[in-house]
Amino acid sequence: MSNNEVDIGVRVEVPNSIMDHLTKPLYEAKLVYYADTFENKVRTFCMNPGGLVSEEHYEGGIAVVNGHSYNDASLRTENTNFAMLVSTHFTKPFGEPIRYGNYIAQLGNMLTGGGVMVQRLGDLLLGRRTDESRLAKSTTRPTLKTAVPGDLSFVLPHRHLTSIIEAMRAFDKLAPGLYSRNTLLYGVEVKFYSSKVNVNNRF
């Protein structure tokens, strides 16, 4: 049995108008980018046009971010959200990717008092924390009202943040306006993987 992978990143929220040309014909666009600096794979996942950012809890009470959308048009919002995840494959001697992912999520919980963090992309790029006043100035209105304004650079490793920023800059060519100061980033989003059975030609 083996499993040495974990995907860690953020949930991105932007106005529908930025993603409509992708989500209307495709609903969920699957975008992949290999980051310039660290060459990590960065992918989009779970795209929700007109959706809501949500909070869910893992074992041990760890709060992480997720998202969903409703089939009922009357329940849809003016925003689209999706995960942007950095794929991480660890090598020996480390072999506890689930523990690592939980640890990163717990850092976010520590800084928010147990909830999900939100930051404007513009504040992240300027190296400053998003606070209540800066969030109030955002033209993108957060759909997760309980999210706590903060600074994701205190939570996500430099490798992950750099890869996410580089991918967002690249994806902006496909969806102009994505790489905007008012784009909202929620953290942490973590995807774990089950152990795989190692087989050979005899089994």
What are these regions (language model features)?
Residues 1-203:
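Residues forming the flavin
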